[in-house]
Amino acid sequence: LSQNAFLAQIYHKPGVLTRRKPSQKELEDIEFGLPIARKLADMEIGQTLVVKNKTVIAVEAFEGTDKAIQRGCEFAKGGCVVIKVSRTNQDYRYDSPGIGPQTIKTLIEGGASVLALEAERVMVVEQEKVIKMSDEASLTVICI
């Protein structure tokens, strides 16, 4: 059985989860990066993309989400948008893409401004902590 069936409360519908809303420029970066992230995920390259000023800064590969975020934030010098998606044919019985407090810590340390998650397809574990940490750092978390 799919994990989604039992964990529906940690897969969010579209909307902003934090107090800070994305700027118009950040929304444009999300719009630019989302189709790229989906394509890369479907090619089984990675599920995380770092974008700034409509430029791809980093792509997740074998190293995993946190390392891709660290690398992207380092090159972007902060203020970047991080997009996390799932594959179109994601098998949720075995693998559920997700983020949690460690991801948020990595984003904050790197100076990212937005985390955009694919709505109802990327899980948020320890949600209250994720939102509290993000709000305290003025990091936007949005489900798209």
Where are these regions (language model features)?
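Conserved mixed alpha/beta catalytic, RNA-binding, or beta-rich assembly cores of soluble enzyme
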Residues: 1-104, 108
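C-terminal binding/interaction regions
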Residues: 105-144
